[in-house]
Curated annotation (Swiss-Prot):
Source organism of this protein record: Geobacillus sp. (strain WCH70)
Protein name: N-acetylmuramic acid 6-phosphate etherase
NCBIfam families: N-acetylmuramic acid 6-phosphate etherase, PRK05441.1, PRK12570.1
Reactions this protein catalyses: N-acetyl-D-muramate 6-phosphate + H2O = N-acetyl-D-glucosamine 6-phosphate + (R)-lactate
One example GO MF annotation: ether hydrolase activity
Designated gene of the protein: murQ
Function, in words: Specifically catalyzes the cleavage of the D-lactyl ether substituent of MurNAc 6-phosphate, producing GlcNAc 6-phosphate and D-lactate.
Length: 295
């Protein structure tokens, strides 16, 4: 079975990898990595459909749940944990589940990816509902933990999606929308942390970013819902206000304070020259979309 997967096959360009110079190794890795973005581009239609599903979940109060084992699980967690500071959402809104739990983030947990019962328990522990979207991630497209999770999600009526790096992936059968990015053989045979992992990260970036834009977390190309939890982010928040309104730093700082540290509110207050209360009301009526609040 494994030998049929392109991610497990040997790469003809690197048959003598151990004899290459460091420069040659880096060159071939770079050349192979350049093929990843092209492979992802061929799946944009499916990624778009999946994003629309995620947006629909968010709009009805649902969540985005990533599931994976090993590198795939870690990438899901990586994308999930960046959403609160970047888009100002609750940490529960986007979550990453990895076979074997948090220990598996830094250590291999033997047998975890083959444990189908564990997937169901993990989803039950977060109270999965029909409003949620579950996206299973597996380079091979056949990880039992992920398949079991998708199967359970479908049973309770949740939306399901999958990301694999082989065509005709097993997990695609359990997904409402499947993304199959064919990255081909790795330079190091079977090491799917390389091209396959890069492809998965690119797709996850697209899904979370486009979905958040779809629910009003971005104005122009600015992170207007950024959570300023430290000095650097507070300075970034003020710069965002400056970029969005063309005011100087002192004015941005003054409105940032007046808006109680809420970038969106400060922007609306400046551009419409209105009170904090009016800006807040406009944003609420516009479901958080700054552009709509300004109309």
């Amino acid at each position: 079975m494994l030998e049929r997967l392109t991610t497990e096959q040997r790469n003809n360009k690197t048959q003598n990898l151990d004899e290459m110079t460091t420069k040659e190794i880096l060159q071939v890795m770079n050349e192979e990595d350049q093929t990843v973005a092209i492979a992802v581009s061929k799946e944009l239609e499916h990624i778009e459909r999946l994003v629309q599903k995620v947006i629909a979940s968010f709009r009805q109060g649902g969540r985005l749940i990533y599931m994976g084992a090993g590198t795939s699980g870690r990438l899901g967690i990586l994308d999930a944990v960046e959403c609160p500071p970047t888009f100002g959402v609750e940490k529960e809104m986007v979550q990453g589940l990895i076979a074997g739990g948090l220990e598996a983030v830094t250590n291999a947990v033997e047998g975890a990816e083959d444990n189908e019962e564990l997937a169901v328990k993990d989803l039950q522990s977060i109270g999965l509902t029909a409003k949620d979207t579950v996206i299973g991630i597996a380079a091979s497209g056949r990880t039992p933990y992920v398949i079991s999770g998708l199967r359970y999600a479908k049973q309770i009526g949740a939306t399901t999606g999958s990301i694999a790096c082989n065509k005709g992936a097993e997990i695609s059968k359990y997904a409402d929308v499947s993304v199959e990015v064919e990255t081909g053989p790795e330079i190091l045979t079977g090491s799917t942390r390389l091209k396959a992992g890069t492809a998965q990260k690119m797709v996850l970036n697209m899904i979370s970013t486009a979905s958040m834009i779809g629910i009003g977390k971005v104005y122009k190309n600015l992170m207007v819902d950024v959570q300023a939890t430290n000095f650097k982010l507070k300075e970034r928040a003020k710069r965002i206000i400056m970029e969005a309104t063309d005011v100087d730093d002192k004015t941005a700082a003054r409105y940032y304070e007046a808006a109680r540290g809420h970038v969106k509110t400060a922007i609306v207050m400046i551009l419409l020259q209105c009170s904090y209360e009016e800006a807040t009301e406009r944003l609420q009526k516009a479901n958080g979309f700054v552009r709509k609040a300004l109309q």
